[in-house]
């Protein structure tokens, strides 16, 4: 089959069989079977995900990463290859990322068989990008200890950029993503005896107000930050004073100092609630993803490889405000660079955003990704 047939076949199979983070068992088996068909050795440091390796002629080792997990979303696309899993969908394009890396593996194996693979290549089929921090898990498991990786590259489909456009940015390209949760415990009473209670309802109102003011009064207005309240609840019945309260949300920032400011303010809010309302209040933070930092040292190689792949380069002036665990590779493993590949096509109706029930794209965009990957490999220079 030709390459367009290859990416169409594999991407649509993966699209029909999405799996959630840390449960990508069938996806992992599918990738392993593909690698076995090429007689390529691989490791599985975690229960899901695969790390493959090909030895080239050069002394350098570079890595390429694709995430393989899906989202808990009910697909609404009316296509023959729609998800066969109830309320699970590849709504972030990871089926495309995985397919592109599979085709790149095929090309690299062909080059190796011909004695023309220029450098050593590590292929990272990574689980749990959406939740679970799969990149960090792999690094902590020692998955890359035996590879002297010098650079890590990755891509993400971007339905807000037209086909044929590649979006890049040096330094911060995506924000940190940190979840926070407030837990309030007070004393309930009948509403007729509310003076005897310690109301978590009133306390929660205070928390809501104070959180909403963090962005306005404590963060630089020229920087892009999000302090989002996603869900809150107090009490159980209409005629009782709430004895409990709960609030959760997410923080998005590309500046670690700003994240520290937000966390400190939230701790102060929790302490103020205790004093003002005589209720217990605790704030907890889930381990988030740090900002994805693109190494400027790799910029020239990235841009040249994209242009040679017939992609138009757009230099984004500000970072995206969503999180991405590719960030761990640049933070802990090696200089890294993350590129967004445009997939928007209004004529074909491919216009909806990531994490939506109608996300779709033309598989031919994946050929450009593989051309970009190959150009990077053929012209790689140590940084």
From Swiss-Prot:
One of its GO terms (molecular function) is hydrolase activity. Pfam families: M20_dimer, Peptidase_M20. Its EC number is 3.-.-.-. Keywords: Hydrolase. The keyword Hydrolase applies. InterPro entries: Amidohydrolase, Bact_exopeptidase_dim_dom, Peptidase_M20, Peptidase_M20_dimer. NCBIfam families: amidohydrolases. Belongs to the peptidase M20 family. This is Uncharacterized hydrolase SA1230. It comes from Staphylococcus aureus (strain N315).
């Amino acid at each position: 089959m030709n390459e367009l047939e290859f990416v169409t076949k594999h991407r649509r199979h993966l699209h029909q069989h999405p799996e959630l983070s840390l449960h990508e068992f069938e996806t992992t088996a599918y990738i392993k079977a593909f690698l076995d068909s090429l007689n390529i050795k691989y490791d599985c440091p975690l229960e899901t995900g695969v790390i493959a390796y090909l030895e080239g002629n050069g002394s350098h080792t570079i890595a390429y990463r694709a995430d393989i997990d899906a989202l808990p979303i009910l697909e609404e696309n009316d296509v023959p290859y729609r998800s066969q899993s109830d309320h699970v969908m590849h709504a972030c394009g990871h089926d495309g990322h995985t397919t592109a890396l599979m085709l790149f593996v095929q090309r690299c194996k062909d080059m190796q068989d011909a004695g023309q693979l220029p450098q050593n290549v590590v292929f990272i089929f990574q689980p749990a990008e959406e939740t679970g921090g799969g990149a960090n898990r792999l690094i902590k498991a020692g998955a890359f200890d035996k590879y002297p990786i010098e650079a890590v590259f990755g891509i993400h489909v971007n339905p807000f950029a037209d086909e044929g456009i590649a979006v890049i940015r040096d330094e911060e390209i995506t924000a940190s993503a940190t979840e926070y949760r407030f837990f309030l415990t007070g004393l309930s009473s009948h509403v007729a005896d509310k003076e005897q209670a310690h109301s978590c309802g009133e306390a929660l109102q205070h928390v809501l107000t104070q959180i909403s003011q963090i962005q306005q009064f404590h963060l630089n207005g020229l920087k892009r930050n999000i302090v989002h309240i996603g869900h809150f609840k107090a009490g159980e019945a209409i005629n009782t004073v709430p004895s409990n309260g709960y609030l959760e949300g997410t923080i998005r920032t590309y500046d670690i100092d700003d994240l520290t400011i937000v966390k400190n303010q939230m701790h102060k809010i929790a302490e103020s609630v205790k004093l003002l309302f005589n209720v217990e209040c605790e704030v907890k933070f889930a381990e988030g993803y740090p900002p994805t930092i693109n190494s400027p040292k790799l910029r020239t190689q990235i841009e040249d490889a994209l242009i040679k792949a017939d992609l138009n380069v757009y230099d984004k002036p500000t970072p995206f405000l969503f999180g991405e665990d590719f960030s761990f590779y640049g933070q802990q493993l090696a200089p890294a660079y993350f590129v967004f590949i445009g997939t928007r096509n209004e004529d074909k109706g491919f216009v909806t955003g990531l994490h939506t029930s109608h996300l779709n794209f033309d598989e031919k965009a994946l050929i450009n990704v593989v051309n970009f990957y190959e150009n990077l490999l053929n012209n790689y220079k140590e940084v």
